[in-house]
Regions:
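Acidic catalytic/metal-coordinating carboxylates
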Residues: 34-38, 61-65
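Active-site residues of response regulator receiver
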Residues: 8, 54, 82
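Active-site beta3 strand of CheY-like receiver
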Residues: 46-52
């Protein structure tokens, strides 16, 4: 049974939480504390899977509490309840917490958030990797895109369109801005999944402040991996995004689903980015195993990490509160038949796009030769559409003068 801690200096709020969550007592063991020090004392006695804390409290405030929880118990999911709408303050707090929730909050939204977090362990079983992922507060950007966006944002009159276009090419920037915009949109029914919409929602002034003052963007450190190119990884993500969106456009799917497919396609290998940036030595060992044993990179990851990049990426995105459609597309992009996707959507589009991009790419990535999940496609009645998609995608990538 999952264990959750709620912290608020208002006895009335805690009493309301008890009543609201009473029906969930068969799923979660819940504890309640009126101040940070009491919460930390309780956490010293037993571990907690999640902590939900008010932001503004006397003495040690919510951010300081969450920071200490992060230090003591990295894998504990951290959520702040707040009425703050200042994007910079939210961004700075998101260095410590994983998600924000509005205060006053909607009971259904809080229950849904806790349920989503409770289910993330299915994507990533290894506790050491969970600890590493849970401590992240940003993901690095491709160097050329990082310097391009910083130059544009530092200009006297930066262009919102140019900034949005740059963000839409980079998984690290996309994930961070989606995390912030979904936190800043306190209480809105929708969750943002499109990087361009995220930039538009925040506005150019806020993005400037976030990048230049709060430093939410970082640059990927130059590392030389044998058998792996970070440039190829970025190119593959960008192409997969375009292909995934095109597949849903061909099938006349809802425009919002097509945009979700684009975002999921760009982010589908974000677990590789996290592993390469934060665990470079074991990541290189996994790369070496693909050559030494002639195995796929997925199998090599499992041997070295006890996890693979799909699960790592899904765990991170879910922890940061990205929409479930994106999380599931990342989690199951190699084996969509393991999911419960009943219809053609972002998951299937990203799965097929990943395979087609590898087929059509001139620069192959060692150990990465994904295969189509034909059982999944047959279950959706789509096995006869593969040739149509492939023909259209080949045409899409042909130079204009051909």
């Amino acid at each position: 049974m999952k264990r959750v801690m709620f912290v608020d200096d208002s006895p009335n709020v805690l009493s309301g939480l008890r009543r609201m969550l009473h029906k969930m007592s068969n799923e979660w063991e819940m504890e309640f504390a009126e101040d940070a020090r009491t919460a930390l004392a309780m956490m010293a006695e037993k571990p907690f899977d999640a902590i939900v804390s008010d932001m503004r409290m006397p003495g040690m405030d919510g951010v300081a509490l969450i920071r200490e929880v992060k230090r003591r118990s990295p894998r504990t999911a951290r959520i702040i309840l707040s009425g703050v709408v200042d994007q910079k303050e939210i961004a700075e707090s998101l260095r410590e917490t994983h998600q924000f929730m509005p205060k006053p909050f909607r009971p259904k939204a809080l229950r849904a958030t806790l349920a989503r977090i409770s289910g993330l362990d299915a994507y990533l079983q290894d506790e050491k990797i969970r600890d590493t992922v849970a401590q992240l507060d940003t993901l690095p950007s491709f160097p050329s895109l990082y310097f391009e966006i910083m130059k544009e944002l530092d200009a006297p009159d930066p262009s919102l369109e140019k900034v949005a276009a740059i963000v839409a090419k980079d998984p690290g920037m996309t994930v961070k801005l989606l995390q912030i915009v979904n936190a800043a949109s306190l209480g809105l029914a929708r969750r943002f999944s499109n990087p361009v919409e995220a930039v538009q929602q925040l506005g150019i002034a806020a993005v400037q402040s976030l990048a230049l003052s709060a430093h939410v963007f970082t640059c990927f450190e130059s590392r030389a991996f044998k058998g792996f190119s970070i440039t190829k990884l970025w190119d593959h993500g960008a192409n997969t995004a375009r292909i995934a969106r095109k597949i849903l456009e061909i099938e006349r799917a809802d425009a919002a689903l097509a945009e979700d497919a684009y975002t999921a396609g760009m982010l589908h290998d974000i677990g590789k980015l996290m592993l390469a940036n934060n665990l470079p030595e074991p990541f290189q060992r996994a790369l070496d195993l693909t050559q030494e044993k002639g195995i796929r990179f997925l199998a090599a990851e499992e041997e070295v990490f006890g996890a693979n990049h799909a699960g790592v990426g899904a765990y991170l995105l879910g922890l940061w509160g990205l929409p479930t459609t994106i999380v599931e597309a990342v989690a199951f992009h190699h084996q969509p038949s393991r999911s419960e996707a009943p219809t053609l959507g972002p998951l299937t589009a990203v799965h097929v796009a990943n395979v087609l991009e590898h087929e059509l790419s001139e620069s192959k990535i060692i150990g990465c030769e994904p295969k189509l999940d034909l059982d999944h496609l047959a279950a959706l009645g789509l096995q006869d559409r593969i040739g149509v998609w492939r023909e259209q995608i080949v045409r899409m990538f042909q130079p204009d003068d051909e």
